[in-house]
Amino acid sequence: MPEGKIIKALSGFYYVLDESQESGKVVQCRARGIFRKNKITPLVGDYVVYQADNDKEGYLLEVKERTNELVRPPISNVDQAVLVFSAAEPTFSTSLLDRFLVLVEANHIEPIICITKMDLLKTDEERETIMAYADDYRQIGYEVHLTSTIEGDGIEKLTPHFHNKITVFAGQSGVGKSSLLNAMSPELALKTDDISSHLGRGKHTTRHVELIRTANGLIADTPGFSSLEFTGIEAEDLGLYFLDIRDRSGDCKFRGCLHVKEPGCAIKDAVEHDQIKEYRYQHYLEFLTEIKDRKPRY
């Protein structure tokens, strides 16, 4: 039986990109009743087995195991998230970036940090500040790209990361996500209004998610992580999603250390010696308080 990947779901139809051929054929499929009986809802991003009645229509037979699953937008098997933040207009926010990084790490998705609008930095001091932040995150182990769609800087180094992967874009509103996409793939120009209406405003104006074929990969046309709450993340697990904290937490004196007031805490020691940046630690404490103060849902 042929296999493929769902790239669009709309009105009970699932549009499957046939991956057994290089033709890029898309087959419109319905789901068998067995899916409803077993309470399985196929998602955009799912790898599926299907049966084709002809070249254009068929039925889904099987949904393969998912590596991850996002709720908003409903999409599965996301390989990476490009976290787009601007160097200026709006101001670069490490707090918001760290929040996105926690959410991405918790969903087992590879993050790529992309700082746009580098051309808007007017002074050497402004540029040095952004470069220092970029170095901080690189030292933690993150991929960081500095780009300017106006000057075309950095785009060519970013594009190869999309090859054969499902990618979502996320980040601040108004940071130029759609401009970045168009700089990478000029053929998307026709879709700019559509993409910017989703990505730019951070509001969902349509009821379906679609994966767009571009840069030899698939990119979601809807922003990832529209909810920025730490739902499902427990206080004792938060440190796992700060890589610089996770790598050192095994050196704490007490198992289960939350790195707040506990004696013999390797994290607080690392902060004092500038091995973990103070702002990262403060964000950890802020997020920890937010999680502890979270009202239980019944």
Curated annotation (Swiss-Prot):
Entry's InterPro entries?
G_CP_dom (IPR030378), NA-bd_OB-fold (IPR012340), P-loop_NTPase (IPR027417), Ribosome_biogen_GTPase_RsgA (IPR004881), RsgA_GTPase_dom (IPR010914), RsgA_N (IPR031944)
Which segments constitute the CP-type G domain?
67-228
Question: Which annotated residues bind Zn(2+)?
Answer: 252, 257, 259, 265
* Cofactor notes: Binds 1 zinc ion per subunit.
- Its EC number(s): 3.6.1.-
What processes in GO biological process is this protein linked to?
A: ribosomal small subunit biogenesis
One Pfam family it belongs to: RsgA_GTPase
Cellular location(s)? Cytoplasm
Return the broad EC class. hydrolase
Q: Name one GO cellular component term.
A: cytoplasm
User: What molecular function terms (GO) are annotated for this protein?
Assistant: GTP binding; GTPase activity; metal ion binding; rRNA binding
Q: Which cofactor does it need?
A: Zn(2+)
**What keywords were assigned to this record?**
Cytoplasm, GTP-binding, Hydrolase, Metal-binding, Nucleotide-binding, Ribosome biogenesis, RNA-binding, rRNA-binding, Zinc
Belongs to which family? Answer: Belongs to the TRAFAC class YlqF/YawG GTPase family. RsgA subfamily.
Record's function text: One of several proteins that assist in the late maturation steps of the functional core of the 30S ribosomal subunit. Helps release RbfA from mature subunits. May play a role in the assembly of ribosomal proteins into the subunit. Circularly permuted GTPase that catalyzes slow GTP hydrolysis, GTPase activity is stimulated by the 30S ribosomal subunit.
Q: How does it assemble?
A: Monomer. Associates with 30S ribosomal subunit, binds 16S rRNA.
Q: State the name under which the record lists this protein.
A: Small ribosomal subunit biogenesis GTPase RsgA
**Coding gene?**
rsgA
